[in-house]
Amino acid sequence: MIQVLLVIICLAVFPYQGSCIILESENVNDYEIVYPKKLTVLPTGAMNSPHPCCDPVTCKPKKGEHCISGPCCRNCKFINSGTICKKARGDDMNDYCTGTTPDCPRNPYKD
């Protein structure tokens, strides 16, 4: 299974306006960290379109939305508690969404 890394970078384009750019990559090393004032061309794979969950001024979830991205975030809302966010491999155990965060917390019953 190929996992896609979503990195959200908020750039201050103008004093009162920002933009949320999402970089998609299978490998974090595909992208370099750039300073917003020096960014002229987006890296390969970057999408410079408004993210439906992101307030472009604050680069936080829009009013009424819970999250922007993450394994437990879908359509700007937290995924229901108890939903598997990471399937077990081998002797491992499944990890589950909590319903209160976009992150996939480690199962507390794991060693």
From Swiss-Prot:
Inhibits ADP-induced platelet aggregation in human platelet-rich plasma (IC(50) is 6 uM). Keywords: Cell adhesion impairing toxin, Disulfide bond, Hemostasis impairing toxin, Platelet aggregation inhibiting toxin, Secreted, Signal, Toxin. Residues 1-20 form the signal peptide. This is Disintegrin DS-AC. It is found in: Secreted. A motif (Cell attachment site) lies at residues 89-91. Disulfide bonds join C53-C76, C67-C73, C72-C97, C85-C104. One of its GO terms (molecular function) is toxin activity. The keyword Signal applies. Heterodimer; disulfide-linked. It comes from Atheris chlorechis. Pfam families: Disintegrin. Belongs to the disintegrin family. Dimeric disintegrin subfamily. The keyword Disulfide bond applies. Residues 21-47 form a propeptide. Its main location: secreted. Residues 47-111 form the Disintegrin domain. One of its GO terms (cellular component) is extracellular region. SUPFAM superfamilies: Blood coagulation inhibitor (disintegrin).
